[in-house]
């Protein structure tokens, strides 16, 4: 995929990812976090990691298998998002809250990955052919 395609894909992919992940975070992040914070997390966490997944990693893995790229991207995104969430809001509510929040972030990422794979299988946006 050429760089222009990656940039063209970025805003639509971001909106799609936010549309999938934010409801998961709203429902499954600890109720200790206000609704505004849970919605903010859906927008902010993806805004922090999505450019790396879409713009930085593909050129780095251009000569590698897609599986290797996916392993790197889908490990980086939830790990970085858990770290960011913890640094911003962690420690409030105890270990049980933190584990639940991490599970919500990982689950949201897993769901958006699976939804993206389904759309990719159908040639969404013409970028995955």
PLM features: residue spans?
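A generic, lipid-embedded transmembrane alpha helix
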Residues: 41-60
């Amino acid at each position: 995929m050429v760089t222009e395609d990656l940039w063209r894909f970025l805003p639509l992919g971001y909106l799609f990812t936010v549309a999938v992940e934010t409801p998961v975070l709203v429902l499954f992040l600890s109720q200790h976090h206000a609704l505004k914070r849970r919605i903010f997390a859906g927008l902010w966490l993806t805004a922090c990691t999505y450019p790396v997944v879409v713009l930085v990693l593909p050129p780095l893995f251009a000569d590698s298998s897609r599986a290797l790229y996916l392993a790197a991207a889908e490990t980086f995104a939830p790990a970085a998002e858990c770290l960011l969430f913890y640094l911003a809001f962690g420690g409030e509510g105890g270990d049980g809250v933190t584990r639940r929040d991490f599970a919500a972030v990982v689950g949201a990422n897993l769901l958006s990955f699976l939804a993206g794979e389904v759309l990719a299988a159908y040639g969404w946006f013409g970028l995955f052919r």
